[in-house]
Regions:
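N-terminal catalytic or cofactor-binding beta/alpha core of small enzyme domains
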Residues: 1-118, 127-139, 145-157
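Short, internal active-site loops enriched in acidic
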Residues: 120-122
């Protein structure tokens, strides 16, 4: 099994919301046998199945955090209280926060779970990332590689 699982969440049809799946695309261009890549699309709840049996997981999604577009926040779900929002127009069905809470209640958390949230500029129906989120995509790829190196060092220790 791969040392690290990276799960991208988001709709490719909603501008910057596509950041998760597009990160998976970018990483698949740099094929690495120690990274398992999962494009979860807009099914945030479906990520729970990829938590089982994995020790190190990163989830990447567009997150409206009130920051500048393209801002990247590494979120440790055990250190913050994820707020569950009632969003009647969410394309994710149940959102990422709900999926995290459900995994926690089902005791299906991986040993090491990180969430990378990227502030979107626009999640309107269009086909392209905004310039700030394009820049964030490149940074997020580097974050994943840094995390893989950390996981490999842990395995060697």
């Amino acid at each position: 099994m791969a040392a690290l699982t990276v799960i991208g969440v988001g709709s490719r049809l909603r501008g910057d919301d596509a950041i998760g799946p597009l990160l998976i695309d970018a990483l698949s261009d740099q094929t690495h046998s120690q990274i398992e890549l999962v494009d979860a699309g807009s099914d945030a709840l479906g990520i729970i199945e990829y938590f089982q049996g994995r020790d190190h997981v990163i989830v990447v999604d567009a997150c409206q955090m009130g920051r500048d577009a393209g801002c990247i926040e590494e979120i440790d779900p055990t250190q913050i209280d994820l707020v569950i929002k009632d969003d009647p127009v969410s394309l994710h069905g149940l959102g990422l926060a709900e999926a995290i809470k459900m995994a926690e209640s089902l005791q299906m958390f991986p040993e090491d779970l990180k969430i990378i949230g990227i502030e979107p500029e626009s999640i309107q129906f269009n086909g392209s990332l905004s310039v700030p989120v394009q820049r964030a995509l490149k940074k997020a790829v580097k974050i994943v590689h840094t995390e893989l190196n950390r996981v490999k060092q842990l395995a060697e220790a």
